[in-house]
Amino acid sequence: MLNIVILDDYQDTVRKLQCAARLDGFNAKVYTNTVKGVGQLAVRLRDADVIVLIRERTPLSRQLIEKLPKLKLIAQVGKAGPHLDVQACTDHGIAVAEGVGSPVAPAELTWALIMACL
């Protein structure tokens, strides 16, 4: 069975989404807290086939990636940034999927907040 780990869901929203029912056929674990250090993360992620990152909250360094031999896919909510060692993923045959979005929405929100302050 595929082991899916969803990290850093601080507000416990993933399980409340309608699409969360799609995880029912998998061994999926959602973490609402965080751990620090490569050792603690390696223990938490040791059986993961798939890791879902909520934003850039948890860094996945080469040192950590090398401790996760079962890992096949990292899905990043939003754009993959410097918190994720993409080259290490490539070197270890781990696929990286990143979310894309419209750059317009953040710009619109910024202007709405500016105008609200006036």
Short names for language-model regions:
Residues 1-49, 54-55:
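N-terminal glycine-/charge-rich "phosphate-binding" loop or analogous flexible N-terminal tail
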Residues 50-118:
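Phosphate/diphosphate ligand-binding glycine-rich loop within oxidoreductases
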